[in-house]
């Protein structure tokens, strides 16, 4: 019976120390969150520039509610596409150098929309083994032939491409890998696309806002500005709006005809109520702050360097220069115990366990922000050093 299966599945998950519970946050004060009556310094948030607490962005959202109401009321293609959606799409496209952008309610939805709307049976999809779950799910659902290459191994990827017989080839990768914090080789991936007439889809959820001189993400970080038609025609680029941008949603940028095709064929875009218009107003304000946010990014870089320098056991650290700083533990139960010890000391650092990461690679994922205080980073590092000693 299905009821027995549910009980057995839950019991099995609990026995492996993989059972998850929702943490209810009752209040937020900058980097501090209130959980179960205890104030904790939050080192789990993807709000890398602290913009979710920015007053200008908050005021833009409030003004958007006054102008357009609390909700869109319809899908984009019916009567839910407002001027603020249109304006922020044009703003991001101009900032990035793409011809057109499209607003989605979430990054997961955007990835499903792109892969499901553009890739089909008979195509070949090449995915990094550590890609986000949404990319993996979408690739399988596309019914294309899916190849998975070893993490960041472009030689392995090229061998796969050479062996593939499919006509249309797609390379799909995270920009910044969410569990390890390392960065894709954009120049290398683009070179393979040109060499083998392939297309490149990049999910830069954790790169946009923090990478590049003007915060424009992994392409700017790698000096791969997409002004040439040669590059632009091959790249589709997704950024989320709930991490560094500090609001909610996602946008996909590409050549105009590609985005136009998504509007025609992408079911996750067509068959859902449009994102709240006021959020688009907040995103627009945030994009301006990000473009001129060199000081925020410098502060974040200093915080990352301070944290890595302060951890005594360097073997715990991965090779990450980004705000995502995993501490490799291995055993899931041990990771939970350490996370609880940090919580008792006033810090919220989640234990990341399978199936989010491979078996025996459980970790603590420290997420740093430009708004973290030096004293809090040093205190956290000191507690980690004591617990891991």
Model-derived segments and their meaning:
Residues 75-81, 89-113:
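Short loop-beta-helix segment that forms the pyridoxal 5′-phosphate
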Residues 299-305, 314-346, 356, 368-370:
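Conserved PLP-binding catalytic core of the aspartate aminotransferase-like
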Residues 47, 147-202:
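Active-site phosphate-binding strand-loop segment of PLP-dependent enzymes
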Residues 214, 220, 226-261:
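Active-site PLP attachment segment
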Residues 2, 7-8, 12-68, 198:
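N-terminal "arm"/small-domain region of PLP-dependent enzymes with the aminotransferase-like
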Residues 274-293, 299, 303:
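Structural motif of enzymes handling amino- and sulfur-group chemistry
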Residues 55, 59-63, 67, 94, ...:
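PLP-dependent enzyme catalytic core of the Aspartate aminotransferase-like
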Residues 114-133:
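Conserved PLP-anchoring active-site segment centered on the Schiff-base-forming lysine
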């Amino acid at each position: 019976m299905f009821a027995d299966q549910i009980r057995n599945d839950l019991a099995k998950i609990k026995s492996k120390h993989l059972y998850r519970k929702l943490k209810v946050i009752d209040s937020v004060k900058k980097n501090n969150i209130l959980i179960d009556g205890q104030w904790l310094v939050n080192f789990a948030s993807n709000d890398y520039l602290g913009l979710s607490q920015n007053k200008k962005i908050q005021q833009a959202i409030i003004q958007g509610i006054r102008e357009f109401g609390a909700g869109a009321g319809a899908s984009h293609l019916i009567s839910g596409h407002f001027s603020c959606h249109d304006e922020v799409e044009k703003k991001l496209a101009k900032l990035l150098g793409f011809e057109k952008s499209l607003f989605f309610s979430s990054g997961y939805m955007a990835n499903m929309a792109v892969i499901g709307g553009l890739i089909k049976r008979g195509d070949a999809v090449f995915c990094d083994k550590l890609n986000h779950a949404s990319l993996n799910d979408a690739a399988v659902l596309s019914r294309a032939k899916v190849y998975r290459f070893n993490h960041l191994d472009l030689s392995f990827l090229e061998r796969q491409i050479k062996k593939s017989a499919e006509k249309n080839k797609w390379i799909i990768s995270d920009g910044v890998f969410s569990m390890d914090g390392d960065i894709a080789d954009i120049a290398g991936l683009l070179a393979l696309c040109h060499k083998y007439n392939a297309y490149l889809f990049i999910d830069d959820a954790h790169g946009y806002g923090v990478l590049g001189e003007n915060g424009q993400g992994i392409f700017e970080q790698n000096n791969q500005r997409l002004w040439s038609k040669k590059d632009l025609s091959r790249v589709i680029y997704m950024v989320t709006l709930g991490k560094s941008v500090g609001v909610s949603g996602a946008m996909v940028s590409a050549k105009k005809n590609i985005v136009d095709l998504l509007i025609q064929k992408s079911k996750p875009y067509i068959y859902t109520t449009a994102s709240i218009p006021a959020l688009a107003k907040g995103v627009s304000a945030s994009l301006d702050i990000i473009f001129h946010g060199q000081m925020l990014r410098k502060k974040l870089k200093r915080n990352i360097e301070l944290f890595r320098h302060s951890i005594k056991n360097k073997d715990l650290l991965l090779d990450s220069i980004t705000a995502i700083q995993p501490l490799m533990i291995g055993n899931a139960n041990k990771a939970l115990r350490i996370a609880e010890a940090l919580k008792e000391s006033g810090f919220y650092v989640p234990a990341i366990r399978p199936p989010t990461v491979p078996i025996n690679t459980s970790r603590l994922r420290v997420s740093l922000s430009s708004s973290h205080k030096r004293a809090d980073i040093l205190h956290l590092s000191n507690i980690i050093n004591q617990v891991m000693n």
